[in-house]
Amino acid sequence: MIYVVMGRETIPDVSAAIGFTASFLPTAERRTIYALVQAVSGAVRFCIDGTTPTATKGVRLTEDSTMEVWGAEAMRDFLCIENIVQSDPTVEVIYFGRGGLA
């Protein structure tokens, strides 16, 4: 399988729980398969099960670490928040979908 970049975004303010921008999420027309996520300038906490993360609840993604979020449901349910109040991290996201012939 070959994956191609479908889009990218920077989430600049994670002081409150926030998810991916809806226009990047999978639809019948937009075949996004997964999102590559990086915490920049600080750690964040995230949930992909529909619960809301807090500064002390959720899976911790350390500064400059990356992780992948696979599948439409997990991408819709993804929420993240800064791990330490006023640490001002940002989140970089690259969205991938199917492409090419393999």
Task: Name each model feature, range by range.
Residues 1-10, 100-102:
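A short "linker-to-beta-strand initiation" element
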Residues 8-30:
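Surface-exposed ligand/attachment interfaces on beta-rich extracellular proteins
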Residues 33-35, 71-89:
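Noncatalytic modules at the cell exterior or secretory-pathway interfaces
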Residues 38-58:
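Short, surface-exposed beta-strand/strand-loop-strand elements in extracellular ectodomains
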Residues 56-73:
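Intrinsically disordered, low-complexity Pro/Gly/Ser/Thr-rich segments with frequent PxxP/GP/PP motifs
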Residues 91-101:
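Low-complexity intrinsically disordered segments
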